[in-house]
Regions:
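Short acidic/glycine- and proline-prone juxtamembrane loop motifs at membrane-interface regions
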Residues: 128-134
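Membrane-interface transmembrane helices that cradle and orient dolichyl/undecaprenyl
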Residues: 140-153
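TM-lumen/periplasm interface segments of multi-pass membrane proteins
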Residues: 15-93, 323-343
Length: 343
C-alpha cells in the first residue's frame, strides 16, 4: 500500500509540474526531497541491506574487505567520524539521487517524465540494493558532457573515479564510440542480438568467465544466474522502439540526440543477449539507463496526432512494469517498506 500511495503522490506532483514554471521548480524540489527521504530513511529494505550493514560494522583498516576502494574508503571515513550505518545510507541516498536528478535535468527534454521513468523502470529501487554500482553510474553519467565537448581526458578521469565505486563502470568507456552516426552499424548490432533472445547463449557466456576473475562468484551464484521474468517481459517494448527509430532516424539531428539513440539501441541489443540473466543485466545498467532520456525524446519527435497514442501506450507499459516488479515481485526486497523512524 505504501508504494501505491508513493507512485500516486509522484503522479500528482509531476502532473502539477506541467501547469506553471514556478510550480515546476517547486514540484521537482518536493519530488527530490521525497525520494531522498524514502531511500535515505529505509531500514532493512532490499536483499543486500543486511550484508552491507555487516560489512560496514566490520570494516576497518586491518579488514578492508573485497569492496572497491572508492566505496571502501568513503565508508571508513564515515566510521572514523562516528557515523552509524543508517547515517551512511542516508548520505549515499542524497548523493545518488541528486546526481541522477542533475543528469536528467541536463539531458531530458521532459524532466518530469524522465523522473517518473526513473521510478517506474526501477532504477530508483535498484539503488536500494546495488548501492555501489548505482553511485558509480550516477557519477559517470554526470561526466558524459566531457565526451560531448571532446574533453576525453576529463571524461576518462571521471569514469575511473566512478569505477572506484564499482568496476563495471569501466564499460562506460564505450560511450564516446556512440557519437559515431552509422545507422547500418547499429542496425547490424541489434539484428545480430535478436537470435539470442531464444538461444541459450547466456549460460555459455557465464561458463567462459575465468575462476580468477574478481567477480567470478557472481557468475556461479543461483540468484545472479537465474533469469528474471520481468526483464524478459521488458524486452518487448524496447525492441519495438528500435524498429521505430531505425525508420525515423533522420529526425534525431542533434549530436546529443543521436548519442542517446545509439546508446539505447546498443543497450537493447545487450539486453537481448542477456535475456533476463541477472548478472548480465547488471553489466548493462550503465547503457540501459539511457531509456529514461530516450523515451521522452522519441515522444517529442513523433507527429502531433500520434503523440497521445504513443504517450498513453508507454504510460500503460511503465505502470504495468511498476506494478509487476515493485508491487507484485517486491523489487528484490523493497516491499514492505520500513523506516528507521519507526524502530
Amino acid at each position: 500500500m505504501f508504494y501505491v500511495c508513493f507512485i500516486g503522490i509522484v503522479f500528482c506532483i509531476l502532473i502539477s509540474a506541467k501547469l506553471d514554471a514556478l510550480l515546476l521548480r517547486v514540484s521537482l524540489f518536493i519530488f527530490l526531497i521525497m525520494i531522498i527521504l524514502i531511500a535515505g530513511l529505509r531500514y532493512q529494505i532490499g536483499t543486500d541491506y543486511a550484508t552491507y550493514r555487516e560489512i560496514y560494522i566490520n570494516l576497518s583498516f586491518d579488514n578492508l574487505s573485497y569492496l572497491e576502494p572508492g566505496y571502501r574508503y568513503v565508508n571508513l571515513f564515515f566510521k572514523y567520524i562516528g557515523l552509524s550505518y543508517e547515517a551512511s545510507v542516508f548520505i549515499f541516498a542524497i548523493i545518488t539521487n541528486v546526481l541522477f536528478y542533475l543528469f536528467i535535468r541536463r539531458y531530458s527534454v521532459s524532466v518530469p517524465v524522465s523522473l517518473l521513468l526513473y521510478l517506474c523502470l526501477n532504477y530508483y529501487f535498484i539503488a536500494f540494493n546495488t548501492v555501489r554500482q548505482m553511485i558509480g553510474i550516477a557519477i559517470f553519467l554526470n561526466g558524459i558532457d566531457y565526451a560531448f565537448k571532446k574533453k576525453y581526458l576529463y571524461f576518462f578521469l571521471i569514469t575511473v573515479f566512478a569505477a572506484l565505486f564499482h568496476y563495471t563502470i569501466f564499460i562506460g568507456m564505450l560511450y564516446p564510440i556512440f557519437k559515431i552516426n552509422r545507422k547500418r552499424m547499429y542496425m547490424i548490432i541489434w539484428l545480430a542480438s535478436i537470435p539470442f533472445i531464444v538461444l541459450p547463449i547466456q549460460n555459455i557466456i557465464i561458463k567462459l568467465i575465468p575462476a580468477s576473475f574478481k567477480y567470478a562468484s557472481y557468475f556461479t551464484s543461483f540468484f545472479f544466474t537465474k533469469t528474471s521474468s520481468a526483464a524478459v517481459f521488458k524486452l518487448i517494448v524496447p525492441n519495438m522502439f528500435v524498429i521505430l527509430i531505425l525508420y525515423y532516424i533522420s529526425v534525431f539531428d542533434k549530436t546529443t540526440e543521436r548519442l542517446w539513440v545509439n546508446v539505447f539501441i546498443f543497450s537493447v541489443a545487450f539486453a537481448n543477449i542477456a535475456h533476463g540473466v541477472n548478472v548480465l543485466i547488471r553489466l548493462n545498467y550503465v547503457f540501459q539507463i539511457s531509456e529514461i532520456i530516450f523515451y521522452p525524446l522519441v515522444v517529442s519527435k513523433i507527429q502531433k496526432f500520434q503523440k497521445p497514442i504513443v504517450s498513453w501506450l508507454l504510460l500503460g507499459y511503465f505502470v504495468v512494469f511498476y506494478i509487476f516488479t515493485v508491487l507484485v515481485q517486491g523489487a528484490q526486497g523493497v516491499v514492505p517498506y520500513q523506516s528507521v523512524l519507526f524502530l
